[in-house]
């Protein structure tokens, strides 16, 4: 289109682009929401239970190390996430304003972001799992954002990069 992109802090562009094109999910909210929805909406709780089990499997991949990574994308979680999206959408539409709604909505948007990011997964990505004392993170990590950045910039006529640091 007829756009000119002005990109400030260009010296941080690689890190910012990696972050923009990566996505992560945490195990802890899955378990907390599962408990919250156990009685209120069992279908959502069941869906979250399957996601929680998947995250336990991923956690075990790290062994004694705090992290693990692989080139292959975690395709087995995608059907579980899609099921969660379907189970949640109807409930979210009919329960606005409730305390549970806000908590589920936040996780729902994280899942949507994760699934959108998964569409870009190729040889420039890795699957990264990190364990902390009380949580497990699953991340689709974009190692090389240059292709996606280039595609985004091509949507405009020009791009001007600024950096006071360079």
Which role fits each region the language model picked out?
Residues 1-166:
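Conserved coupling segment at the C-terminus of the helicase ATP-binding
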């Amino acid at each position: 289109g007829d756009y000119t992109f002005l990109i400030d802090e260009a010296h941080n562009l690689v890190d910012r682009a990696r972050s923009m094109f990566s996505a992560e999910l945490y195990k802890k909210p899955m378990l907390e929401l599962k408990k919250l929805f156990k009685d209120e909406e069992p279908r959502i709780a069941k869906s979250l239970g399957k996601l929680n089990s998947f995250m336990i499997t991923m956690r075990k991949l790290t062994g004694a190390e705090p992290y693990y990574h692989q080139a292959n994308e975690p395709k087995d979680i995608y059907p579980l996430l899609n099921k969660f999206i379907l189970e949640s959408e109807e409930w979210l539409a009919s329960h606005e304003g409730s305390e549970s709604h806000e908590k589920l909505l936040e996780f729902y948007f994280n899942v949507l972001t994760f699934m959108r990011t998964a569409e870009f997964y190729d040889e420039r990505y890795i699957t990264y799992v990190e364990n902390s004392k009380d949580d497990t993170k699953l991340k689709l990590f974009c190692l090389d954002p240059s292709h996606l950045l280039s595609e985004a910039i091509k949507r405009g006529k020009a791009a001007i990069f600024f950096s006071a640091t360079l």
